[in-house]
Amino acid sequence: MSVQLDPQGQLRHLVTTEGLPRELLTRILDTAESFSGVLGKSVKKVPLLRGRTIINLFFEPSTRTRTTFELAAQRLSADVLNIDVATSSTSKGESLLDMLRNLEAMQCDAFVVRHADSGAAEFIARHVAPGVAVINAGDGRHAHPTQALLDAFTIRREKGPLEPLTIAIVGDILHSRVARSQIHALLGLGAGEVRVIGPRTLLPRDIQRLGVRVYEDMDAGLDGADVLIMLRLQRERMRGALLPSESEYFSRYGLTEQRLERTHPEAIVMHPGPVNRGVELDPQVADGPRSVILRQVTNGIAVRMAVMSIVLGGHGEAPAEPIEEASS
């Protein structure tokens, strides 16, 4: 039984995009669209989660993800606590479950979890008290669902419906939790074609079973693509010499203006960050007119607001009327 859905099929935890119904994926994006309107106002708060407490529990360092989750919770008027795991009681020998029990005793409503171990978020979701939600902010090589959802949201805003689009994911697919989540989300939302491009040493052996087309040749994989999602090399997760050098990687798989010409004339360039300029992206492409990288960051706030409002607020339907501003 899925830990993510309650018996009525409503989202109670977000651990992965794998297996989520298309209707639910669409509802998240639609709800995010409604929150985007709020973020454009002078007062960027709504009172949906006033009185709720959300704890950011990050066992791995993060800047963009933790900050956007914190902003998203604050925009919903929730109270936010950031736990410094390096100085927490877990560093003094307390078990993870004991720490969770103590935090639950403080009447928290949700944990946003980032962890180096694959499966950590699901483990926590299966052991939290009833009524406490868990949102996966990235676990090992397993999943990063909110990144995938904000990428899908960005694509829909920039390019319209996903059905006719060819989307290419380029780089270190093997070690990327983002790539797996993107594939499940994009195909779940009906994307026309999803391609993965990378050297053989950075492609999972069974990746084709997910329904993607696989390319080792960068130029062939880029041909006619509408969306390019560039991924960084996950050096911290690599074991052994999987690549000769970063300069050779760039010569074969780096996105340059010349390579960009092989794509659709109106193709967009995306990256989940952090960007390694001169490794996966030429600086001129990263800063060029087709790059929507900074818009991804902005969209991440609205998407994470949507996820929080759904797991903590029930049905998560997009408001029929514009959301009213809170007084403060």
UniProtKB/Swiss-Prot annotation:
Catalyzes the condensation of carbamoyl phosphate and aspartate to form carbamoyl aspartate and inorganic phosphate, the committed step in the de novo pyrimidine nucleotide biosynthesis pathway. The gene is pyrB. The lineage of its organism: Bacteria, Pseudomonadati, Pseudomonadota, Gammaproteobacteria, Chromatiales. L-aspartate binds at residues 92, 177, 232. Its EC number is 2.1.3.2. Carbamoyl phosphate binds at residues 64-65, 114, 144, 147, 273-274. Pathway: Pyrimidine metabolism; UMP biosynthesis via de novo pathway; (S)-dihydroorotate from bicarbonate: step 2/3. This is Aspartate carbamoyltransferase catalytic subunit. It catalyses: carbamoyl phosphate + L-aspartate = N-carbamoyl-L-aspartate + phosphate + H(+). One of its GO terms (molecular function) is aspartate carbamoyltransferase activity. Heterododecamer (2C3:3R2) of six catalytic PyrB chains organized as two trimers (C3), and six regulatory PyrI chains organized as three dimers (R2). GO terms for cellular component: cytosol. Keywords: Pyrimidine biosynthesis, Transferase. Belongs to the aspartate/ornithine carbamoyltransferase superfamily. ATCase family. It comes from Halorhodospira halophila (strain DSM 244 / SL1) (Ectothiorhodospira halophila (strain DSM 244 / SL1)). One of its GO terms (biological process) is 'de novo' UMP biosynthetic process.
